[in-house]
Amino acid sequence: MEQVVRHMYLGTLSDLRGSNLIKVITGARRIGKSTLLEQHHAALKAKIPEASVLSINFDEPGYRFLAEKGWKEVYDFIVGAIRPQEMNYVFLDEIQNIRQFEKLLEGLFVHPKIDLYVTGSNACFLSSELATLLTGRQFEINILPFSFPEYLEIAGGKENADRAFVNYVMAGGFPEAVKFAKVGEHYSFQYLQSVYKSIYQNDIKARYGIHSDISYQDVVNFLADSAGSPVSPGNIARVLTNSGKKIDNKSVAKYISTLTDSYLFYRAARYDIKGKQLLATQEKYYAVDTGLRNAILGKEPYGDSGHLLENVVFLELLRRKNQVWIGKVGTCEVDFVARAADGDTKYIQVSQSVKNPETLARELAPFDKIPDHNEKILITADYENCSRNGVRQINIVDWLLS
């Protein structure tokens, strides 16, 4: 399959080359972390042909013998394989497979001739222990599935972007899923189901000691079906228990934590716009990919279009390097508060359609209560781009391609 060059992520890696930081590439399995390392390797060689590069994927059969050894043996192997008189670029893929990998990273970090890049599929490898060892020494680059423009590079359909967007929401942006969707949607669907099962078996069940597959799947389904709705462990436990699926708050909280640690879901906390503070309750969770979400639920997304649009917008805001929260202003909710690194803040509402006057009034109402003059945007699937009392209304496809 033709590769999509992930320019934004590659640009970050290029900017950080030679810095005294461990470049930590995170994201769900099969999302393209290894491919990104390969692309960075190629870009590095193109820029510095004589560069010394050592690349190890601990998931590959040829290197699994290392995963079975202690961290010190792996360290000795790596140091013995590099050129001691020059800078070496060391790429370690799926580092969490090494026991006590944090000690391995600490040892390699202080080596004067190593510029270190690592990937991992589970957030526990950014745990408190590693954070303590490497405080201020790491830079995380979290990889998300293909954006809509990246999807179009592979799937085609630029001449009919609206139709392509429907397919994008259906199949999502996992690289291989996009490839399979070109053959048939059901192939993409089956592939994504296998991805989820693999993540559950390899990254979640054994690692976290999940004893009830059924209870776990109940929570996953609830979270996937509730994307864009406020939830809490207590609320989920209560609803499931009332439907005959008994589970306690503690188990639900644990399960949700495993899903975010595995990058299957992302949490959006609530933010009090007037009080300028984060709130501790009723956060929302969004799936890492709409196609994966559809595959988990085992259904096509008809009837869920509003929440799916919201999910797409949330992920795109993250791609654009924003901090993203759910806004609260008085008794009203703003779908997203997005703040860029330079402090630029936007307030965003997302709706499938605002052709109904009542729907339009409901979507605009929270903006009227916001006391500042930051940009306010209403994103819809309607074919109408306009300004309404200082609120910019824009079509979802136009926004994604802008």
Could you tell me what each predicted segment is?
Residues 2-18:
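Pre-Walker A adenine-sensing motif
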Residues 45-61:
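Conserved catalytic segments around the Walker B and adjacent sensor/switch elements
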Residues 36, 40:
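Hydrophobic positions on the alpha1 helix immediately C-terminal to the Walker A/P-loop
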Residues 33:
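Conserved lysine of the Walker
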Residues 25:
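Hydrophobic anchor at the beta1->P-loop junction of P-loop NTPases
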Residues 121-123, 128-230, 263:
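Interdomain motor-coupling "hinge/lid" segment immediately C-terminal to the ATP-binding subdomain
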Residues 54, 184-344:
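Accessory nucleic acid-recognition modules appended to NTPase machines
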Residues 56-85:
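Short glycine-rich substrate-engagement loop in P-loop NTPases that contacts/grips substrate
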